[in-house]
């Protein structure tokens, strides 16, 4: 979708995504802390079906939500595919951040813009931020291209390193210990 839209279509997509994520934040304000839902709003999780008036969310990962402030998904599930020699480190430094980032409207908005770098469309970051910054709550500082780029660089470093360590774990498991590796790893990811 990102690689086929013109400027007006892209702006409409971002406006649509921002409007749909705003519904999540409204739900959380109305229902929280009883029930709160999280959303990974990156642009690659959305489609605009032909003839539909709004974007549709298609994230295939496990839904993240809280009841009375208590996470309903066992955070340890995120560590199942983490190499065993790294689980303690991931638990200590990353797990909480992964579990909370998608409840924060600003962090979701930054992730939405930063994801355009991963999608090889850096020229769309400024137009996306233009749309996103128009709808930020009054008094909240706008998101800059620099902030989005910095977020992306850190995210890219973390996930590239993580994948490299998973490949090392697969090598050790299959070649050194001659055991079955239980996970399918992606091929080269262009970031």
Language-model regions, residue ranges each:
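A conserved mid-domain beta-alpha-beta active-site/ligand-binding segment of alpha/beta enzyme cores
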Residues: 86-136
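Conserved structural core of kinase catalytic domains
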Residues: 1-18
